Amino acid sequence: REDTTQFIRSDSLVLQFLEYSNIPITDNNKVKLIKSGREKFEDLFEAIRGAKHHIHLEYFNFRNDSIANALFDLLGEKVKEGVKVRAMFDAFGNWSNNKPLKKRHLKAIREKGIEIVKFDPFKFPYINHAAHRDHRKIAVIDGKIGYTGGMNIADYYINGLPKIGTWRDMHIRIEGDAVNILQEIFLDIWHTYGSTCGNSVSGCGLQSK
C-alpha cells in the first residue's frame, strides 16, 4: 500500500498555531527554559520578592500544600509593601485536585489583602461549562517578568508523588515584549471574574513598564 504520510516542519506548525490563536509574534524577548519544579519556584519566588507594583497569577489550581502556603505568605508580605496582588484559579481545577482551596483557605488569603477569584464557578447545569476551563499557568510581575508553561502551584513538582515518582514538566521565564501579551490574557479574564478594570496593560491601575 502506498505510504501517504505527510510530514510538516515543526516551525510551520508553530506558525499555524499562532495564526489560528490570534497570538501576535514579538521580538525583543529574553527567554529562559525552566526544567524542574525546584528551579521554577525558586525563580518565581525571587521575582516576586523584587516586585514593586503588581503581581498577577493565573493557574488551573493552587494545591493547598507547603509551596502554595509559602507563596501566599510571601504575597501577603508584598501586599504590606504596597504591591497589588491578583490571583485566579479554575473552579474545576481546584475541585478536582486532592488538596483544594476551601472557603476557609480563601478567607485567610483574602485577609492578607490578596485579591483571589475563581474562573467559571460551578453553576447549574454544570455540563454547559465542562469544556470551558482555564488551564493557563501565567505569572506576571510588574509587567516586566512573565512565566508560563506546564506547572501549576503544587509541591509535587519538587517532591514527586508516591505512585508516580518524579514529576517532569517544563516552564519558561520571559522578559521583553511578550510579557505584555501574558498581561493582556490575564486582564481579559480578570475583567470577567475579578474587578472591572479593562483588558489592557494600562487597566487595573497598571502602567506599562
Question: Where are the language model's segments positioned?
Answer:
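N-terminal localization/anchoring segments of enzymes in phospholipid and broader phosphate metabolism
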Residues: 1-209
